[in-house]
Amino acid sequence: ITTGATSPKVTGDQLVLSFNDTSNLDADPVHKPANGAFTVLVNGVANAVTNVTVQAQAKTVTLTLTTAVTHGQSVTVAYTDPTTGNDTNAIQNAAGNDVASFAATAVVNNTPAATDTTPPVFSSAAVNGDQLVITYTEANTLDAAALAGSAGFTV
């Protein structure tokens, strides 16, 4: 498994592992580990793998997770070679050598933050001297640029 720029990454329910072996991974779709050979934890809670796909020439293994990861969650992945010796029940290179088991490894979470689709809601209006103060309820910060000048208000 690689580190740095090619370290494990997750976007939504797709977790991609990259390998740096000099040869390609085994391209035979039958020669892949069981879903249970991987342990994925999201914020410390198991997130089961539902599918394993090996991209031989890209030297990647993509895990499909039961539940999509959301922005900001902490993710780790571990792999246990399910059998001893070199066999087709493991991630292998083209020469038939098994990838060694690896302990929990941090995963880069590339899942984008959810977009805010809820508009601000009018709460109240009050006159304070020569100013009209309009209050909105909003989970985030109002966009000050959108409110520059009269911003479409008529008094």
Segments and roles (model prediction):
Residues I1-V155:
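Non-catalytic beta-sheet/beta-sandwich ligand-binding modules that flank or precede catalytic cores
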